[in-house]
């Protein structure tokens, strides 16, 4: 399959399905993070999502093998974050990392294992969009929360564990989890979908 082909209607349908699956996994990661590590859920959310979403990402790349699929998924996620009250940076991070990840995957014709792993790592960092203002735009983030009716106790709890140490942990954990999740996703695609002739 040529990666230069334009996206067709069936391609867009496939992208929509995979984006919906990715959204479900982000939702699961959000609630799971809050249950596993209350107080640190925002810190570990990108890592947890990266760990469990590799199969969806790798299957999309293997099935489509065209530029645009990964980008569209990033854009859709960014639009969701923006319309749900997050900062504009949420949209910017997802769209930028989605497009960059798409270019990296295309450089290896969507077949290079290392290229796809790097692509997935970059895409996973797009989920920092909604939370990175907590570290670097604290006052604006708090003002946004107050405008949405959040009280002082809620805000204090939210920022209790936000510091540069937890930022470094979040970045490192996301890298490791994206590599593990992406590797696992590649194994599952090869074992179950390639052999079955689905991709």
Model feature map: region roles:
Residues 9-18, 45, 49, 68-73, ...:
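Alpha-helical transmembrane segments of integral membrane proteins
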Residues 42-102:
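Alpha-helical membrane segments and adjacent membrane-interface helices in multi-pass membrane proteins
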